[in-house]
């Protein structure tokens, strides 16, 4: 399994669209792709797949609006979200994991890097 993190410090530059397009390309090549929508305050990856989702080769792990009421996310909340993603990854066993990140540097980025160590 290979992991690819799509990151930019600025919002609105196409991270989500780029992630979705990479996922579609990899799926067309026969790869199973798992996407983590790590922009958990304003997730939008599911909207990228309206109409053709669920795709048989692409799975999206999104927080929906579960964190929308929080201005600041505690590390433990982020850790819990990522642990759930890991469980799904182990059950699906994808060829690629794509991670669509939020802009700037947040607890999400810190926990993503820490989870890579584990």
Each language-model region and where it sits:
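Short amphipathic alpha-helical segments and helix-helix/interface helices
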Residues: 23, 82, 86-89, 110-113
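Walker A/P-loop phosphate-binding motif and the immediately C-terminal alpha-helix
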Residues: 2-40
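Short, function-defining helix-loop hinge/capping sites that tune catalysis or transport
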Residues: 19, 45-47, 108
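N-terminal regions of ATP-driven nucleic-acid and macromolecular assemblies
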Residues: 2-3, 52, 56-58, 111-114
């Amino acid at each position: 399994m290979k992991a690819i993190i799509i990151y930019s410090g600025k919002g609105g530059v196409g991270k989500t669209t780029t992630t979705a397009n990479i996922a579609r390309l990899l799926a067309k090549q026969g790869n199973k792709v798992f996407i983590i929508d790590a922009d958990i305050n304003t997730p939008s990856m599911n909207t990228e797949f309206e109409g053709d989702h669920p795709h048989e080769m692409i799975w999206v792990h999104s927080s929906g609006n579960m964190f929308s009421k929080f201005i600041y996310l505690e590390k433990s909340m982020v850790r819990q979200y990522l642990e759930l993603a890991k469980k799904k990854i182990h059950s699906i066993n994808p060829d690629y994991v794509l991670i669509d990140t939020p802009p700037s540097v947040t607890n999400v980025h810190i926990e993503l890097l820490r989870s890579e160590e584990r």
